[in-house]
């Protein structure tokens, strides 16, 4: 059994009737605790094939789109800490080997001022860190990050230079135009890849504005 916990809701996925192995899509890791007190939890269960296959999982929340591509198969050994039980054990009352799906999540330090803006007409560094669900005992390492920026609402995307800045962490340097050349702010599109070949692409249509 595999488990997916995500901060957003799926917008398109394979038809459940074609899937045979249980995978849990939960609104958050807190769903297990919610189930324990008898509250209704936002949990969706799908059947996935037992054999290894490549999957795409897409979400959209408040205009931010995220697309994961990852490889999954039926686990033969559990890969979750004993202190954090599998959601399926609690919600679906199922037992057996369990592990989270190896989805890469992204954390941003945009280096903004107190007004959540950045200075126009200069090179601006941002920090992006890839991470995984806490339940994943042996996560891969994020090895590559590609960044793009748009100043016209996503019509034109410009490549942004990036460099490694620690484990799973990268610095991207965005060359800001003058403020009047980006009236709608700065959009970001980040693509990360880990050592196992899993990827995530996240598009933020208005990450921040210029001052």
Residue ranges and their predicted role:
Residues 1-28, 32-211:
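Low-complexity, acidic Ser/Thr/Pro-rich "mucin-like" tracts of secreted and single-pass surface proteins
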């Amino acid at each position: 059994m595999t488990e997916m916990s995500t901060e957003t809701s799926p917008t398109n996925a394979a038809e459940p009737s074609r899937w045979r192995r249980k995978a849990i899509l939960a609104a958050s890791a807190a769903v297990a605790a919610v189930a324990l007190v008898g509250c209704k939890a936002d949990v969706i269960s799908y059947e996935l094939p037992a054999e290894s296959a490549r999957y795409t999982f897409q979400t959209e929340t408040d205009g931010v789109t995220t697309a994961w591509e990852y490889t999954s198969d039926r686990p033969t050994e559990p890969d979750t800490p004993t202190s954090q039980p599998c959601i399926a054990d609690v919600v679906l009352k199922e037992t057996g080997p369990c592990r989270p799906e190896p989805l890469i999540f992204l954390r941003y330090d945009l280096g903004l001022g107190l007004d959540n803006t950045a200075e126009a007409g200069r090179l601006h560094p941002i920090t992006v860190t890839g991470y995984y669900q806490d339940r994943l005992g042996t996560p891969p390492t994020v090895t590559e990050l590609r960044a793009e920026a748009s100043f016209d609402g996503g019509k034109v995307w410009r490549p942004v230079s990036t460099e490694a800045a620690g484990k799973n962490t990268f610095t991207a340097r965005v060359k800001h135009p003058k403020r009047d050349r980006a009236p709608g702010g700065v959009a970001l599109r980040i693509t990360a890849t880990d050592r196992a070949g899993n990827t995530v692409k996240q598009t933020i249509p208005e990450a921040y504005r210029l001052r």
